[in-house]
Amino acid sequence: MIIQKIEFNDKKDKFVIETDTKESFLLSYNDFEKFKIHNEMIIDDELYAHLLNISKFGEAFDISLNFLSYKLRTEKEIITKLKSKKFSTEIIDDVITKLKNLDLLDDYNYAKIFINDKINLTNYSKRRIINDLYQKGIDKKIYEDYLEEVFGYNMELDKATLIVETKINIWKEKYEGYELKNKIFTFLLQKGFSYDVAKQISGMY
C-alpha cells in the first residue's frame, strides 16, 4: 500500500491521507509528524491497521467532544452515541478512558448537578430523581450518599405538599372523605413519593 495523496482539512484540522488502494484516513498534525507521513510512502498492513485505529479513535473522540459541547453527558450517553456511529468496543473504551482522564466525563459530578437542578427547579420526588438517573445509566451507588445528604424526608414532604396544593381544589369538587384521601395517596405514590410521605400528606385531608 502506497500513500498517493495528502491534503489538509481545515474544518477538521487534520490531514487526509489517501492510498493507491483508494483507502483513506485522517491524522492529527502530531501523528502525521510522529509517523513521518509523506507521499509515496509504503505502508505495510500492520502500520496501516495501526494508523487506521488512530484515525478511528480521533474521529470518535472528536464526536464525543462535540457531543459534550452542548451540555454535560453521562458515560452511558457517550457510549450510546459512539455505538450509533458503529465504532468498535475497543475504540469506545479508549475514548471513555481519555475523557475521564481529562475530567470531561464524571458520572458523580453529573449526578450532583442533576440532583441540585431537580431540587431547586422542580418538585420531583427522590424516587423520580433516582429513576431519571438510572435511565441515564448512573447507578444509585455512585451518588446515594450525596442524595441522602441534600434530599431528606422533610424536603420530600414539602415537595409533595406543593404538588397536592396545585390539585386539591379540583379534587375536592369530585371527592371527599376516604375517596379524597385515597386520591391524594395514590397520586403521590404514582409521582414516586414514599409510602410514608403519601400517607402523611393524605392524612391531612
From Swiss-Prot:
UniProt keyword annotation of Metal-binding present: no
Cell compartment(s), UniProt: Cytoplasm
Any one Gene Ontology cellular component term annotated for this protein: cytoplasm
InterPro entries reported for this sequence: RecX_HTH_1st, RecX_HTH_2nd, RecX_HTH_3rd, Regulatory_RecX, WH-like_DNA-bd_sf
A Pfam cross-reference name: RecX_HTH3
Location (main, coarse): cytoplasm
Keyword list, A-Z: Cytoplasm
Disulfide bonds: none
GO biological process: regulation of DNA repair
Keyword Magnesium: no
Family affiliation: Belongs to the RecX family.
Biological role: Modulates RecA activity.
Protein's name in the database: Regulatory protein RecX
Lineage per the UniProt record: Bacteria, Bacillati, Bacillota, Tissierellia, Tissierellales
Gene name tied to this protein: recX
